[in-house]
């Protein structure tokens, strides 16, 4: 994980694991990792009451640039349990993303498993003039 966050292996990492609900139905399981040295006392925060990005903003280390990867895959057993997915053949949306500040500091790595019937994604794509 230190390699993904571009920190030394001996630096502390804070892990935030959450199940997100939409209309009282579990919609996604999210695993977020941030360099603890950038965020003093992060382990004392109640992120059920506080937005992670609001907290990061306090320390002027908010993600402004995201490198994202989307994969459609079968749901792993552990996440299927959290998402109440019964069929082992159900597919989910798996996102991996790395968040960087405007200074290029990596401040977040997240893996998220989205229940496919609970979410919808829309994308806009723009091309620069050639």
Predicted regions and their residues:
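C-terminal all-alpha effector/ligand-binding and dimerization domain
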Residues: 1-130
